[in-house]
Structure formats: C-alpha cells, structure tokens
A protein has these predicted regions:
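Signature of extracytoplasmic/envelope-associated structural regions
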Residues: 1-231
Length: 231
C-alpha cells in the first residue's frame, strides 16, 4: 500500500539559508492562551470560554557542516498567518552521537515585528559525532580526563500586553546562557575545569562514583546576555 510520503517540516525560525544547520523536524503546539471556567455552588463546571489561539513551535536541526551559529533571540519570522518570535536555543553534543540544535518560540500579535532582541555569542559547531565545548564557555585540562557530553541552553523571557487573550504588544528580556558538561576521569587526577572570560561556574564540578564505572564530573557555566531595545 502506497503512503503519502514523509511529512515536510516547517521552518519557523528563518534558518533556511544556514550553512551550518539543516531542519530535521518541527512541532506546532497550538493552544488557547485563555481557558476560563465558571462553577456552581458545588464546584461543578457550568460554563467554559476559550480565547487567543497561540502556537509554541519548536524545530530540531542537524549540524550539516562546521561553522559558527549566530542566533538572535527576539527575532521574528512569519509562517503563513502566524508571526513567531525566537525565544530559545538548546544544543546537545555527546560522544558517538550526532549533535542536535533545537530552537523554540511563541507566536505574537498579527503583523508583529521584533521588539527587544538578545544577540547570542557565536557558537562554533562541528558535524562530528563527539562532545564539543560550546560557545567557548570553559576550558578543560587533565590527563585521562575526557569530555563526554556538553549542552547549551539559552532562553529569553517574553512579556505580553493582552486584550481578550490576544497579544497587542510584546517584549523580550532576561536571558542567561547555560552550558553544562560531563567529564569522565580515567587517570589518577581530577580534571581542571575553568570558566572562560565572561562566564562563571555557577555549578562547581561535582563527582559521581558509580559501581563498575569511572568517575564522572558534572558542572555548569553561565553567562548573562543583555537585551537591546529597537532603535
């Protein structure tokens, strides 16, 4: 029996021309912004109203070539009738696994344009299936100490002015970039992990001693990213 073929993912975040990442899949996540109910004396629901349809899309990308990824949280892209603002970026790399980038956002007012934006630092990515130090957030040293996973998460906070569930204005602020890593120790000495300039080890290295396994160290480095108002 013939099928309809594979689905075509939707490019919500304007990365179609990127030479570094390529769209793999997307999710729309459509829902109502307002869901209200009224109850009787017993607390049973007797009325319901819904308003303000929004989408909270996300998209997964493969890393198709080496290079720097440049992202601007708060940037806006129009898809059909939906105006989508980019709010989040998550990158996962690990030993013997393909690196993945996930972008996420929310729809805003019809005909909306970018308000404040947050420019993330350049993120160097390799298509190799290995753990990668992301955004140059830290340095690692130590004989027999190997990075086995590294992830990056950056998310901007969106605030809205609304009327009857519909957004009439929005703004973006409050972004932190968090890079987390796991290091496996096979030598006698613990790894040396230091935050790069502009970064801070907000979760110091902490070890786990598994049964029938090597010592593993986990940590997090964080950097604040300021928002810029439109001119």
């Amino acid at each position: 029996m013939a099928n309809a073929g594979f689905s075509a993912p939707v490019e919500y975040f304007g990365q179609g021309s990127s030479t570094v990442i390529g769209l793999k899949s997307s999710t729309e996540s459509r829902d109502y912004a307002v869901k209200v109910t009224a109850t009787d004396a017993r607390g049973d629901i007797v009325a319901r109203d819904l308003a303000g349809v929004r989408i909270s899309p996300s998209a997964v990308y493969n890393v198709k070539a080496g290079g720097d990824l440049y992202l601007e949280l708060g940037s806006v892209n129009t898809v059909d009738t939906d105006v989508v603002v980019l709010l989040g970026c998550d990158i996962r790399t690990s030993a013997a696994s393909a690196p993945e980038v996930t972008l996420s956002g929310e729809s805003i007012q019809t005909d909306g344009t970018a308000s404040s934006t947050v420019e993330l630092p350049a993120i160097a990515l390799s298509p190799r299936h290995k753990a990668q130090i992301l955004a140059g957030a830290f340095t690692l040293a130590g004989a027999g100490c190997n990075l086995t996973s590294c992830s990056l998460s950056a998310r901007a906070n969106i605030t809205r002015a609304t009327k009857s569930g519909d957004t009439v204005a929005h703004d973006v602020s409050g972004t932190e970039i968090v890079v987390s890593g796991t290091v496996q120790q096979t030598g006698a000495t613990a790894p040396t992990i230091e935050a790069a300039d502009g970064w801070e080890l907000t979760t110091p290295k902490s070890k786990a001693n598994p049964d029938e396994g090597y010592i593993e160290w986990t940590f997090e480095a964080t950097k604040a990213a300021a928002s810029t108002e439109p001119v």
